[in-house]
Amino acid sequence: MSDGSRKSGTKSTFHFVAGLGSGVLSAILLQPIDLLKTRVQQSGKHSLRAALAELRSSQQGLLPSLWRGTLPSALRTGFGSAIYFTTLNTIRENAARHLPSLAAAAPTIAAASGIVAPNANQTSSSLPKLSNTGNLLAGAVARSFAGFILMPLTVLKVRYESSFYKYTSLAGAARDIARTEGARGFFAGFGATAIRDAPYAGLYVLFYEKSKQHLSNLFPQPPQPQLSTTTTLEAAAGQDGGGRMSQSRAASINFASGVFSAIICSIISNPFDAVKTRIQLQPKKYRNMVQASRKMLAEEGVRSMMDGLALRMSRKAMSSALAWTVYEELIRRAEGAWTKRGPEEVQL
């Protein structure tokens, strides 16, 4: 396998499996926060304290109630992450290869002296590099595609978590939606979801990549001793492990970048999330994004657009940071094994 074909990225299977694993893990660990966010957003009168009191008084008790809806959440987040990361990597690879205007600038190498700054091209990632515009577009397109595919599971998850519906099983919930609303019911709120998720994902990838770059420069890894000129040049070009950080340093930078990016993007996109939740829970009362927004603002004021922000911000910060860190580390390991042994022997 040529270096060019190796640099095109790991097999899509690796990205799918890595995305699936990271998504399922984050969904299970953070399900209580997601459930509380849904309860707070389901009406303008709910507060976190009221939601917790309601869960404590339920027949199941507080702890089991906090993990209600874990299965649809894990399925949605797991397969959503798998589809998203696979699609994102495919878009970034093809954009880097075929669209020079979206590709990241190549690293500058002091060819005359053969010397580069020790930390100039260190990276915490093995993923394709794009320009700011490329990252913004790639993230938005990949998230919109994954969101459409997983929309039925999203509707089931939100309704299962809500106290408005007394579903006892996913199959029963699906039958009820199909009977009362038809196929359209499984895509309730997709417009608000797409408008929320596409900008969120695009901005997230943009901020995430820029944050990794800045943190890598702020906290450089000590240079390896006695590197030859050839090794140094290869490291700068990203052609071997010389341009990669240690596992712990890379994971720390990726996690911190994920938290920062999620907080910023959650604040920007929360109004769309609040509207989307109302549409999915009460489709007869909130028919579409424009009507729902007007009704919420007229009846409850601007504050209704920020319902659940603290919970959503907490969950997004942790879930995004965890998912991206686990995903990137699995891909780094796969890339390393690919380089050493060849693709046919690689196991995540």
UniProtKB/Swiss-Prot annotation:
Its main location: mitochondrion. It comes from the Eukaryota. It catalyses: glycine(in) = glycine(out). Keywords: Membrane, Mitochondrion, Mitochondrion inner membrane, Repeat, Transmembrane, Transmembrane helix, Transport. The keyword Cytoplasm does not apply. Solcar repeats lie at residues 10-94, 130-214, 249-333. GO terms for molecular function: glycine transmembrane transporter activity. The chain crosses the membrane at residues 16-41, 69-95, 136-161, 189-212, 253-279, 308-326. It is a multi-pass membrane protein. It is found in: Mitochondrion inner membrane. GO terms for biological process: glycine import into mitochondrion; heme biosynthetic process. GO terms for cellular component: mitochondrial inner membrane; mitochondrion. InterPro entries: Hem25/SLC25A38, Mitochondrial_sb/sol_carrier, Mt_carrier_dom_sf. Mitochondrial glycine transporter that imports glycine into the mitochondrial matrix. Plays an important role in providing glycine for the first enzymatic step in heme biosynthesis, the condensation of glycine with succinyl-CoA to produce 5-aminolevulinate (ALA) in the mitochondrial matrix. Belongs to the mitochondrial carrier (TC 2.A.29) family. SLC25A38 subfamily. This is Mitochondrial glycine transporter. It comes from Neurospora crassa (strain ATCC 24698 / 74-OR23-1A / CBS 708.71 / DSM 1257 / FGSC 987).
